[in-house]
Amino acid sequence: MKGLIDLSLVNGIWTLKLSMIQTVALAIVTLYLGEFIKKHSSFLQRVSMPAPAVGGLPFAFLCAFLSYYKVVNITFDGALQSFLMLAFFTTIGLMASLNVLKKGGVAIIFFWIVCTIWIVFQNGAGIIIAKAMGIEPIFGIMAGSVSMMGGLGTAGAFGPHVEELTGVPGVASAAIAAATFGMVAGTLLGAPVGDRIIKMHNVPTPVDHPELLEADGIDINESDSESKLFDLQSLMHVIAFVGISLGLGTLVSAALSSVFGPLPAYIGAMIVGACIRNYADFTGHISINGAALDAVSNVSLSIFVTMAINSLKLAQLVDLALPLMAILAAQMVLITIFAYLIYWLFKRNYDSVMLGAGAIGFGLGATPNALVNMLSLASKYGPSPKAWLVVSLVGAFLIDFTNAFLITFMAKLI
């Protein structure tokens, strides 16, 4: 067994070091464990809790228990985790099509701007509470837009990056823990707040006024010319574009870092990916299959986030539990206010209610949470195709661009 299992005694505690391959294999096992548990839990399905969190958190707690009682410490090789993180954010860039943005018109740009401004409030509130609670201000940003507006993907990417830059222990684990909390809170809060706004202001809905849908002019069921299926060649094209974006992205990131200071490695890859996507759209010389792109994005995200959660150092969060909960409670209050603000800014109609409910979903968790909130309201009051399109586009990739820059900028200020 020598060479297969790296188990040694370090400072009187047995330490198990998992290789890169073993780390990936474990991530896949816990990912499918999460899928199995979620499949048999109506609550987890209702709140759209991602399988990586469902399977990874129990394992992280087990590791914390074994470490706390000095049974064994388990360490992980995160080399492939970093690569998968870069690949995922590159696919976000490859989704940034200007042609798609045109379908939503001014509403998309306005909603994007409003959500970008809200990032400043999320981080500002987090920093203020962190300082008041006597912890490092950087935890305020980790429990701010990194984990709230950013979700598990951004938390898993920025957490280790910021922890390495600042040298503050527990930063990465705090970001993941806050993002996991936000996934649940975003779904539990969104639809009830939207329902409350509708009833409080007697907002006309499509159920009672079918003409609202006719006036909308957007058909969410309108199929594009692209097949929902993909072949091996389409998949290889996407993988090639991701690889090219990663390579050229290192040069872009280096150039930007020389001007703006240290930036996450994926920024350059996202920018190059967006350039490739729009070159493809406007020239037609190359094609990017959306289904293949989604597949690469989902696989890289699922394994990357599962690896990040598996390696959570929960023991480092014991002293941060109360301050983190205070910050997260404040974020829930603020995002509720934000939903009401969106209602007043966007014509005070049914679309604006749906935008608010969606904003709670991806403002605390992720885009799937936002869509679940909107589906919940739609099942009772009718659909809002325009809001669905706007939230999908802003939450899925647009907000990631501005969030990344604002996180980096505000982190430097503290």
Each model region followed by its residue ranges:
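Entry/N-cap segments of selected transmembrane alpha helices
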Residues: 83, 97-127, 180, 239-243, ...
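Core mid-bundle transmembrane helix pairs that form the ion/substrate translocation pathway
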Residues: 211-277
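Structural signature of hydrophobic alpha-helical transmembrane segments
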Residues: 15-29, 75-89, 138-145, 260-272, ...
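Alpha-helical membrane segments and immediately flanking helix-loop junctions
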Residues: 125, 129-174, 181, 193, ...
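Intrinsically disordered, low-complexity non-transmembrane regions of multi-pass membrane transporters
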Residues: 1-24, 33, 195-239, 281-286
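Hydrophobic transmembrane alpha-helices of secondary-active transporters
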Residues: 30, 57-65, 78-105, 270-280, ...
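Juxtamembrane and boundary regions of transmembrane helices in multi-pass small-molecule transporters
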Residues: 128-135, 179-220, 341-350, 395-414
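Flexible hinge motifs at transmembrane-helix junctions and intramembrane kinks/re-entrant loops
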Residues: 37-53, 70, 74, 192, ...
